[in-house]
């Protein structure tokens, strides 16, 4: 099937580009797109400001031990996890290797292509707000023959634009942290005859149930966050030599932070003696945050002795309306209401458990902080498998009920403290704080094994159809 799809992709390209190897006019004087009239109009990139128009190809300078190597990380803001992972990898490269690598994080689709690739962020946000729509989209595109044909058609239409994106950054190493950024860049590398010269790796950012588009047999390495994902990679045709299981990349400032709970609580002006629960509303402050907060107040207040048995921190994200509503309440227990936070390692370090939806990044960070997790929701498809990943490993529980959530926290803070401690210990054992460093070290080893390359040429006039 894969061979058939590849042949289909190349036949489509032949129809679009033809077999001529003549040079292509790329821009008009005012920078607007130009079109070459063949059987179809061919959309071109907006400008090549950084390209010498007198040259038909671009040559990278000599690559040697003393030369900084370019690393291009492909991502998209479809959910916050992809950018967070990309930036974590970038920071880890800097910490481990200094100026040996120049790492660029880019959404090439958004910057270089047209619809639907340049509109994925808005489309994704719309669909996850209508979860049944997203569920249908996720599962209907899972069969290989469907997503391969879809991606082949897009590749045929936007190949030159993607090629231009790669030419601008001239990477020796490409890292994909998004499921839709394997097939098309790899096809472009094949058409440019660069697959054996440009290192291409995938870093999967879903903990369990990930979309099949994550897996492409043409990658040099596929970094999986769990054994469950590694099994899926092997099932989808990757070889064991291509697969590594290191964990989910978490930003180094979080993973290696040395934090003392008492000091954090003093800094954050929290009660020093009461156990604390962290209630997450995500970046957009979505979900039953207010209902859960009110339920927690009831279960964390000892009516008989008229005193609190716990305190609460609520992260409202960008939802200012929610933050204002919570701040207006006269709480019976200590409550901290926060907006969009950039220092989550401190708030996590100051708390004793967390309530959140099943986003992989938040789960990975919670495990590093040894926080027992109460999962209260998940996005169908890629987040569904995160629930058994947490629950079956004893690192937390799942319930959508605000009242049940509050009851569990109330028991953890009063009659079931041993269970709280055991769950915390299980979370710590499941954590992989060094994952991002293991990933960049392995990429560096792969790069060194290849040795210095004479040159890497991104040819502006190559005929993609010539491989048919």
From Swiss-Prot:
CDD domains: GT28_Beta-DGS-like (cd17507)
GO biological process, one term: galactolipid metabolic process
GO molecular function terms listed in the Swiss-Prot or TrEMBL record: 1,2-diacylglycerol 3-beta-galactosyltransferase activity; UDP-galactosyltransferase activity
Miscellaneous comment text of the record: Auxin activates expression during Pi starvation, whereas cytokinin represses it.
Record EC number: 2.4.1.46
Location (main, coarse): plastid
Family annotation (InterPro entries): Diacylglyc_glucosyltr_N (IPR009695), Glyco_trans_28_C (IPR007235), Glycosyltransf_28_UgtP (IPR050519)
Annotated Pfam families: Glyco_tran_28_C, MGDG_synth
Species name: Arabidopsis thaliana
Distribution of this protein across tissues and organs: Expressed mainly in floral buds. Detected in roots, leaves, stems, siliques and pollen tubes.
Keywords attached to this entry: Chloroplast, Glycosyltransferase, Membrane, Plastid, Plastid outer membrane, Transferase, Transit peptide
Claim: Transit peptide is one of the keywords in the record: yes
Protein name per the record: Monogalactosyldiacylglycerol synthase 2, chloroplastic
Top EC class of this enzyme: transferase
Activity regulation statement: Inhibited by galvestine-1.
Protein family according to the UniProt entry: Belongs to the glycosyltransferase 28 family.
GO CC aspect terms: chloroplast outer membrane
Binding-site list for UDP: 82, 251, 361-365, 383
Induction: Induced by phosphate deprivation. Induced in rosette leaves when grown in acidic soil.
Cross-referenced Gene3D superfamilies: Glycogen Phosphorylase B (3.40.50.2000)
Subcellular compartments: Plastid, Chloroplast outer membrane
